[in-house]
């Protein structure tokens, strides 16, 4: 069975200060087989140490927080078997799952704040 992970969108936030940040998700549409591993890329632009988030939106549902990074350990464990690794040198926070299920078919959003 093939899973389709619906188009990924970059989310842009502006803090209360004049400094802006942005997120880019280069993978527009990904199809994987059930049981295969998954990596969704997220690159950010931010001057200081960012707060990073991954959200999922399943069909007909609201956004659900998968995981977040504030500081400390760069490998973050989330819900539903997802994890993400913060790599400051690459300005990335890629979402991974070792074995996807059909129920993982959804839209995934990376955010910085």
Swiss-Prot record:
Signal peptide start and end residues: 1-20
Compartments, as annotated in UniProt: Cell membrane
Domain of life of the native organism: Eukaryota
Glycosylation sites per record: 43
Keywords: Adaptive immunity, Cell membrane, Disulfide bond, Glycoprotein, Immunity, Immunoglobulin domain, Membrane, Receptor, Signal, T cell receptor
Domain Ig-like: 21-113
Any one annotated GO CC term: T cell receptor complex
Annotated GO biological process: adaptive immune response
Gene3D superfamilies hit by this protein: Immunoglobulins
Pfam families referenced in this protein's UniProt entry, alphabetically: V-set (PF07686)
Disulfide-linked positions: 42-110
Oligomer and partners: Alpha-beta TR is a heterodimer composed of an alpha and beta chain; disulfide-linked. The alpha-beta TR is associated with the transmembrane signaling CD3 coreceptor proteins to form the TR-CD3 (TcR or TCR). The assembly of alpha-beta TR heterodimers with CD3 occurs in the endoplasmic reticulum where a single alpha-beta TR heterodimer associates with one CD3D-CD3E heterodimer, one CD3G-CD3E heterodimer and one CD247 homodimer forming a stable octameric structure. CD3D-CD3E and CD3G-CD3E heterodimers preferentially associate with TR alpha and TR beta chains, respectively.
Role according to the record: V region of the variable domain of T cell receptor (TR) alpha chain that participates in the antigen recognition. Alpha-beta T cell receptors are antigen specific receptors which are essential to the immune response and are present on the cell surface of T lymphocytes. Recognize peptide-major histocompatibility (MH) (pMH) complexes that are displayed by antigen presenting cells (APC), a prerequisite for efficient T cell adaptive immunity against pathogens.
Protein name: T cell receptor alpha variable 8-3
Organism: Homo sapiens (Human)
